[in-house]
Amino acid sequence: HRRTLVVDGYRGELLVDPEPVLLQEYQRLISEENELSKLAEDDVNLPAQLKSGERVKVMLNAGLSPEHEEKLGSRIDGIGLYRTEIPFMLQSGFPSEEEQVAQYQGMLQMFNDKPVTLRTLDVGADKQLPYMPISEENPCLGWRGIRITLDQPEIFLIQVRAMLRANAATGNLSILLPMVTSIDEIDEARRLIERAGREVEEMIGYAIPRPRLGVMLEVPSMVFMLPQLASRIDFISVGTNDLTQYLLAVDRNNTRVASMYDSLHPAVLRALAMIAHDAERFGIDLRLCGEMAGDPMCVTILIGLGYRHLSMNGRSVARVKYLLRRIDIEEAQELSRRSLDAQMTAEV
């Protein structure tokens, strides 16, 4: 007996033998999606800019598919987030320093005329290493990200040395620290990065370029610490996935509460507005790399709030560039103002 299935990726639903009228509606939506994709592809090689001509940097979240990422090279402004944990997760043990050098060199050289941001090892919670199992009652609030690598500094030093060695010839590296919750962690990471730099220079016998340093802003505590961050780092990258999760106290991987996870919640938008305001005030380079960056529903609001550096998955690049070229800055600012006045997501 044949069944008709509809997979709705937007709603996270699987429909079995839907009513004919509902099936017809989904077929219409598929046709619209295909038409929009064709329109977007026509713009994908044009510069990412607003109607006013102001440029917006469209960057790539990378680490999953090198072949696909290389094909996008001419369409993007660089790598906004390279997930270094992916190679760690695919092996049966920690990759050696030499293996990591080769991995990072490949990415830095593939985009040698563009900035490449490598995030240090970000495991724990939903990203586990098979050879370093972590069992916790509340992993989202547990041992993860920079907490792990600062507790085991040898892992951090090996990785940073590999990054610095890989960058010696190209000089296009930025380093991004994940899950930062305090100034102490940044200071300790900076000390270790300086130490790694000295060790690499002793090893190769000449001075190497120092990378730009940034932090993932994904823990609410750091939203209020931008004045203290300004003298310590070069940029912040807002990780909207975890920031939303922590602001709303919702585990997005828990099916009982996942429907409450909402990037357009007024509290999330107000936090993003505060971050953009303080970043400009204190002269911090502002970036955003969560799912919101690739969501056309969110992009206009982000532009209105002042975000001009968006990093997204490859499938979103064409549509976001298509949308950006049609955004009127005054309309975007008005939309963001109205959104900040909203009391509920439905009003946004």
Regions found by a protein language model. Name each.
Residues 34-348:
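Conserved alpha/beta-domain cores
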Residues 8-45:
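Acidic/Gly/His-enriched mid-domain segments of enzyme catalytic cores or analogous surface patches
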Residues 1-9:
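Conformationally flexible catalytic loops at phosphate/diphosphate-handling active centers
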